[in-house]
Amino acid sequence: MEKQYRVLLYYQYVPIEDPETFTAEHLAFCKELGLLGRILISSEGINGTVSGTIEQTDKYMEALKEDPRFASMPIKIDEADGHAFKKMHVRHRNELVNLSLEDDVNPLELTGKHLSPVEFYEQMQSPDTVVIDARNDYEFDVGHFRGAVRPDIETFRELPEWIRDNKEILEGKKILTYCTGGVRCEKFSGWLKREGFEDVSQLDGGIVTYGKDPEVQGKLWDGQCYVFDTRLTVPVNQTEHVVVGKDFFTGEPCERYVNCANPACNRKMIATEESEHKYMRSCSHECRTSERNLYVKQHNLSEEEVQERLAVIEQEQAISQG
């Protein structure tokens, strides 16, 4: 039976005049349709993901296609059981993705070669190729292409500095890069070319498109794909499922993401339900004892109950440390 909701993912680098006005108008339109999601608009284009019913998303896609700026924009469609977002945000930004460059890259003028899923699959098996994950560390940790390089970064804007510090792994190689939907690689691959790397290619349509391709069927992808909505992760490889994620607390195989219960921290952690409850969904002692701890509030734990759990954790840590 066909699911009644969809999640759309899309981007287009295209000049947008008066992006502030367009942002306000687009927010009103999305709310009128009843969509939920997050959309960024800048003078360089649009980058969005929204959820809604089949009827709502059909109307939205029709409206986008009627706008000459977005008529050729590919839209990735996932079936869903319900909304994947809690609110509808359309925000104006100076740039669609932030590399924090003094001299920004325009993907319409400079970007890496686009490879289809089949081409990417074949190329990444070549010994003279290096595959760079253009996403953040927590995205990589729950799933990635087999053999891909994991930049030690928490945000996209840290990537250029990391590349400069580790350029020896790229020199003399054919470079492949990938991200969730493709929007980050458009700019990142262009930056790589400007830095002097000659053979630079990107996965057209990103991981999401790769996982839906009928020929490659997500092969050579291990784990799940992190997504920025309430689903948190989605499957990619249709032929085998290799778990690469590890529980933050125990190191055991796991693919379940939670956020640290201390809102001042909000760290993304992979954790089983057992670990979540045992450690009060908190990444550290400081977060567990924070006055703002949401886990404590959500489960109505008394001070005595909190202290009991802290004592158990402390005792186990003392034993493990010998």
Swiss-Prot record:
CDD domains: RHOD_YceA (cd01518). Gene3D superfamilies: 3.30.70.100, Rhodanese-like domain (3.40.250.10). Keywords: Oxidoreductase, tRNA processing. PROSITE patterns: RHODANESE_3. It catalyses: uridine(34) in tRNA + AH2 + O2 = 5-hydroxyuridine(34) in tRNA + A + H2O. Signal peptide: none annotated. GO terms for molecular function: oxidoreductase activity, acting on paired donors, with incorporation or reduction of molecular oxygen. One of its GO terms (biological process) is tRNA modification. Catalyzes oxygen-dependent 5-hydroxyuridine (ho5U) modification at position 34 in tRNAs. This is tRNA uridine(34) hydroxylase. It comes from Bacillus pumilus (strain SAFR-032). The gene is trhO.
